[in-house]
UniProtKB/Swiss-Prot annotation:
GO biological process: acetyl-CoA biosynthetic process from acetate
Cofactor(s) for this UniProt protein: Mg(2+)
Top EC class of this enzyme: ligase
Protein name: Acetyl-coenzyme A synthetase
SUPFAM superfamilies in the cross-refs: Acetyl-CoA synthetase-like
Annotated transmembrane regions: none
N6-acetyllysine: modified positions: 618
EC number assigned by the record: 6.2.1.1
Length: 654
């Protein structure tokens, strides 16, 4: 394989502010290096010490890492613990009256819940689940809006050793059905409806539809949280109201102690083709990853008000809403709505209102807010912020700079985090008191995370260069299996040609300082006239143009060049048509030529009012590839938030 070429030049560097560095959990580069050295000298000992310090064990482990059945690795296997105990009970002695969750509803209503109150609610609901016949190892589907109830449901499952599988409330009945069948769910927890952006989203109706599709005989009961009071169909033999089953129980439920390798949850990855892929995570190793990344990457302190904007239907909402913050006894904001309702100032108004100190959101949200109101943050008091984070995709340098300057006022470090559903927790991200920042780079691997960049045959790429991103050693929070499909797990993540390396599926470039730059998914690498170009870099160049709000690049087969470059562009102003579109397309082509080089100039530019995205905000590139080739869209688009946009994007401005 020829190395993937990095054509993006980014020379801006931002060192940690001295006041931040002095107070940081890991202070200065020597502090980071000392942790990395400790992991290198005694890898299993490094993780064992952290597991003993940070997790409350009912039975301490004596085995650290079992590699006897690789790649099905086991961590802390003879230890016993309970995730709910670690997230709630252990805080009751000293922090019972501390606010655990600040819930802000779509309409702005706020409800707070303390750790004592959370403990009572989780215990009552766990008892209700037991009364419905749910026990150790049973699978429970959770299909709820963002709410205190969603977190209570997850924690209640963990408390009794049931395995939860959360399905994002934006997914269709068909997607829900696939997951119910694949996981063999015994019980489904849902709501009558959710509320997003002032509009109701039917949930119970989707559950009813999913169960009618057949093959769901495993489901015995459906528990319904009454969020809106809307009329819904009711099956008295199967359905039960949440408030009724919870009210009937007492508020004490002893935790069920489970093996460290007991599955805590199964989460299906979005955007995969074919049958859904149920990523299975452990209890002990997963919890350790969530805790350490909260401490290292977010520099978490007891006084912080933490806000991760992700829905619990995604891995980010598992690790950095439902588990990580609670395991540290944090106070966090939980948000039901969307960033643009009732207007584009919603996030900033909430940061001011709740005095948020750590704010973690997606580049997609940042870019949309730049477009809708780039100056809006100036109208709010954001002085409580001390750290910003991004998650879900690489962030373009220009969006990074806006976030840093306008939101963070050039004093808040940005934790650009690379990780995956499969990794469980952050893998590459800056330790903010130790690592200099470069806009667009996720910087360096966390201590104890051994990353590399290799050729397609697994050969290590020395020094600077681009290739496949891999993990060289097993880590505690890693995926344990694909539910019910170990062979698919082995082939997808540990292909034979990589000789035991974990294949992330992303391409990356390492610069002269050892910083990692994510260049896109492996299938987002273009081969243009023999040059391998990362789509991310061309997108970043386009977004750096003052006219452009958002861009996506895909390849299209070309007789001469191998692949031609097709750009889908959303402008900050109105979508241009006719001659205006051709003129702007020409300007953007020249811009990319100057920013990167003639090789990267898009052959085609198509303008849209938006890009096709999943309901979590990820660009659906497979649809863009089909559009570029002129193919009919025949694949499942149930997760597509804005289907009407596809017709706009069929038209080329030249």
């Amino acid at each position: 394989m020829s190395s993937i070429e990095s054509v993006l030049t980014e020379t801006r560097v931002f060192a940690p502010h001295e006041t931040f560095r002095q107070a940081a959990t890991v202070s200065g580069l020597p502090g980071y290096q000392a942790l990395c050295d400790a992991a290198e000298q005694d890898y299993t000992g490094f993780w064992a010490n952290l597991a003993r310090q940070e997790i409350s064990w009912q039975t301490p482990f004596t085995e650290v890492l079992d590699e006897s059945n690789a790649p099905f690795y086991r961590w802390f296997a003879d230890g016993k613990l309970n995730a709910s105990y670690n997230c709630i009970d252990r805080h009751l002695e000293k922090r019972a009256n501390k606010i655990a969750l600040i819930f802000e509803a779509d309409n702005g209503d706020v409800a707070n819940i303390t750790y004592r109150e959370l403990h009572q609610r989780v215990c009552r609901f766990a008892n209700a689940l037991k009364k419905q016949g749910v026990g150790l190892g049973d699978r429970v589907i959770i299909y709820l809006p963002m709410s205190i109830e969603a977190i209570v449901a997850m924690q209640a499952c963990a408390r009794i050793g049931a395995i939860h599988s959360v399905v994002f409330g934006g997914f269709s009945a068909k997607s829900l059905h696939e997951r119910i069948v694949d996981v063999g769910a015994k019980l489904v927890i849902t709501a009558d409806a959710g509320i997003r952006g002032g509009k109701q989203v039917a949930l119970k109706a989707s559950v009813d539809e999913a169960l009618e599709l057949g093959g769901c005989e495993s489901v015995e009961k459906v528990i319904v949280y009454q969020r809106t009071g809307v009329d819904i169909a009711w099956n008295p033999h199967r359905d039960a109201w949440w408030h009724e089953v919870e009210a009937a129980e007492n508020d004490n439920c002893e935790p069920v102690w489970v093996d460290a390798e007991h599955p805590l949850f199964i989460l299906y990855t979005s955007g995969s083709t074919g049958t859904p892929k149920g990523v299975q995570h452990s209890t002990g190793g997963y919890l350790l990853g969530a805790i350490m990344s909260m401490k290292w990457v977010f520099d978490h302190k007891a006084t912080d008000i933490f806000w991760c904007t992700a829905d619990v239907g995604w891995i980010t909402g598992h690790s950095y809403v439902a588990y990580g913050p609670l395991a540290l006894g944090s106070t966090q904001v939980v948000f039901e709505g969307v960033p643009t309702y009732p207007d584009a100032g919603r996030f900033w108004q909430m940061i001011e209102r709740h005095k948020v100190s750590i704010f973690y959101t997606a580049p997609t949200a940042i870019r949309s807010l730049i477009k809708l109101g780039g100056d809006l943050p100036h109208k709010y008091d954001l002085s409580s912020l001390r750290l910003l984070g991004t998650v879900g995709e690489p962030i373009n340098p220009e969006a990074w700079m806006w976030y840093y300057k306008v939101v963070g006022k050039e004093r808040c470090p940005i934790a650009d985090t690379w990780w995956q559903t499969e990794t469980g927790a952050h893998m590459i991200a800056p330790l903010p008191g130790a690592i200099d920042l470069k806009p667009g780079s996720c910087t360096r691997p966390l201590p104890g995370i051994i990353m590399d960049i290799v050729e397609e045959d697994g050969t290590h790429i020395e020094g600077t260069g681009g290739g496949l991103l891999v993990v060289k050693k097993p880590w505690p929070s890693m995926i344990r299996n694909i539910w019910g499909n170990p062979e698919r797990f082995r082939k997808a993540y540990f292909p034979e040609e990589l000789n035991g390396l974990y294949l992330a599926g992303d391409s990356a470039h390492r610069d002269e300082d050892g910083y990692f730059w994510i260049m896109g998914r492996i299938d987002d690498v273009l081969n243009v006239s023999g040059h391998r170009l990362g789509t991310m870099e061309i997108e970043s160049a386009l977004v750096a143009n003052p006219l452009v709000a958002e861009a996506a690049i895909v390849g299209k087969p070309h007789d001469i060049k191998g692949e031609s470059i097709v750009a889908y562009v959303v402008l900050k102003g109105e979508r241009p048509e006719g001659e205006a579109a051709k003129t702007i397309a020409g300007q953007l082509r020249e811009w990319v030529g100057k920013e990167i080089g003639p090789i990267a100039k898009p052959d085609e530019i198509r303008f849209g009012e938006n890009l096709p995205k999943t309901r979590s905000g990820k660009i659906m590139r497979r649809l863009l590839r089909s559009l570029a080739k002129g193919e009919e869209i025949t694949s499942d688009i149930s997760t597509l938030d804005n289907p009407a946009i596809l017709d706009q994007l069929r038209q080329s401005a030249g």
